Structures are given as structure tokens and as C-alpha cells.
């Protein structure tokens, strides 16, 4: 079968590029052994494919069934250029697999001397023990062993044995490839959905946690008055565009159930354990969003929006705000396609005006530059990330809409905010929509801020 895993193994860059260009393909899916496309390309030394996968957003620290990361495989097989590429993109150099081995264990065992030296030069620990009490240097032949010890000591490493603990990876979440079959089903049998817990209910419908084909999912049941053949046809036509699997910062709609046979039109999407960015910032989840995490979220959102803005035509009726951005298990922010409104859902109503650009509150959608308006929404998200506050929390939606559109109400930037973030916010919130930047222009700015 000439699938993506074979193409990555064989280094067929043209076929891989064509596959990546199809938005319904998920580059972070896994095969039967939990190997992602990146695992295979790293194992087989396919540098061009590795580069392409990383540029398209492949997860660097993804683990297969044996908890090997792509770095474990590249180090074992002595692909020095790929090891350096993975390290450049922040691969976890001391990631532990199911045997307690780190990439350096394998580089030493297989006699990949140069790779072992590179790993130590980048902070790999020479005396971390696996489950069997063996250190990486125990696996190396004598000359390499001495050399690595010497290098590590020069770099300030303590050469005493670090005993194996089952908690080496605690505090990081183990990132698994996604189930590769999920993007194959667009129409879903309503009877196969198992509704577990109701999460939320509002004007547009109900949100449930559920199970489907052994996977945790979120089920969105739409409330639609006077369901008709025409609305049913629109639902069928508009759904497929929301199945975007090809970008790591976009959360696709996995599939839909038409009504009938379902009692209401229904969407399903991946379960996100942390919920939305709104939940994380304002509803006390278990982790702290510090400055570096805030910049990472901003970068994730900017990358996702930059991708969505390349689509022609644009996805209509998509509103960017902190409730429509989901946070994945590995703290990646993803723009949710399940929050896009359908043409038959309350046209002309705004439910989150605090994030909406003034011109979009005043004009019809067809008279607004959507890309510029999205940039304003992004500026409000930046404000929210640095202040941890809900914009205009003391006003009703009606008041916010009126005051932003007609009275010049704007978020006030408090003192003490990083001057870089402050400047970026002001640029993105320019009163003249034509002077706001595009997302592909601010991605490199945020990347620089992240590196600092």
C-alpha cells in the first residue's frame, strides 16, 4: 500500500508534498505501531522529508508505542544532519522511552560516535540510568566513553549515576500520534456516538463529551429552528470545508450527522482535555500561563490563522476569540473549526462582540476585510493573554457592541507589559484596517519573541 508512511520511509518528497497539500490529511497521525510520518523519515534518514514535515508542523517529541521519539530513531541510525535539525527545533534531548533509554543510549550502543558527541554538546546526560541501571556511557566502547565523560565534565555535568525514576517524563505530557482512521469518516452514524457528560448549553446548541470508535470526542448538537431540506443541503455543503487535518494549529471537525436520522444536526471533534483558551485563562485550570507560554499560544494562533488566510475562498462566518481556540494535551493552541457558524445559524448576530473589530460591528460581512478584522480579534487575544482578564467583563454584549462600534471603547493596555508585546498589540489594533499586518508577517516576530 503506497501510503504516507511508505512515502516518508522511501523519501518520496514529491508524493509527500502532494499528500500534505490535501487539507483532509493529518500529518500527525500514526500507523499501527504508533509511528508518525516524522518517525519514519527520521529513521530512514530522509532529510528533505524531515524538513518538509517539520515546516508543516509535525510534532517533534511525538512518541510511538515504545515511547521512542523521532530523535531516538535518528540517533540510533546515525543520521547526524537530522539529529541536528531536530535539536534546532527543540527536540527533548533526554526523552525517556519505555526501557528508560534516552537517545544517547542508542547513539552509544550503535557506535554512532559523532551523533553521541553532538548530543552531549547539546546537553544530553551521560550518566542517566535506564530501567536496567545502565548509563549511556556504559553502552559506549572505551575511547568514546572517555571522550563523552570528559566533554560532559567540561560542560559542568555531575558524572554520578542518575538512578532511573518512573517520573523522568512527568510534567511533560506524552504526545502520541493521532488515530489515523479518524479523518477517513465524514458522515457518522449517530447511533455509534456515546454521549457521556453534558459540558455546556447555549443559544447555538449543546456540547457533550462523548466516545466514538474508542476515542474521546466532543459532540456539538446544533439548535436550529424549522429544520428544512434547504438547511439540510447547506449543512452537507458547508461541513466538508471544516475538515482541515493538515495544520497542527487548526482543530478539524471530524465528521457530522445529518438530521434526520439524528434528532438534530451534529458535529464531532477531538476531545481537548484543557478546553478552550477562555477556560485556561479565566476558569482556573491546573496550569500557569507564564510569559513564555503566552507567547507560545500567540504564535500557535498566528500560525493557524496564517494558514486559514491562505484558503480561497476564506472559511465564512469564522469568529476568532478565546472560546473558539482550543488547547491540546501538549499545550498547543488550535483554532476550532467546530465553532464556525453555518449559513442558517442566526445570520447577523454577534455573540462575542468584545473580540470583534469596530468596522465589522458597523458593516455587513461582505463590506468588511475579513483578514484585517481577524487581526483586530488577535490583538484582543494578545491583550487577554497578558492581562488574564476578560475584555470589558463589566458590560453586557449589547453595550460592548455599541460602545466599540460607536463610542471608541478599546481595551486599555496596563503598565508593566513587555514593550515588545505592547508594540505588537498596537500594530495589530490599528484603527485603519488597511494598516494592520497580515498573520504571516507577525509569525516571525512572535518566533523571535519566543527565542528570547
Swiss-Prot record:
The modification Phosphothreonine is found at residue 173. Its main location: other. ANK repeats lie at residues 2-30, 31-63, 64-96, 97-129, 130-174. InterPro entries: Ankyrin_rpt (IPR002110), Ankyrin_rpt-contain_sf (IPR036770), Kinase-like_dom_sf (IPR011009), PK_ILK (IPR035692), Prot_kinase_dom (IPR000719), Ser-Thr/Tyr_kinase_cat_dom (IPR001245), Ser/Thr_Kinases-Pseudokinases (IPR051681). The kinase domain is likely to have lost catalytic activity but retains ATP-binding activity. ATP structurally stabilizes the kinase domain and promotes stability of binding to PARVA as well as focal adhesion stability. One of its GO terms (cellular component) is membrane. Phosphorylation by PAK1 modulates ILK subcellular location by promoting its nuclear export. This is Scaffold protein ILK. The keyword Acetylation applies. The modification N6-acetyllysine is found at residue 426. SMART domains: ANK.
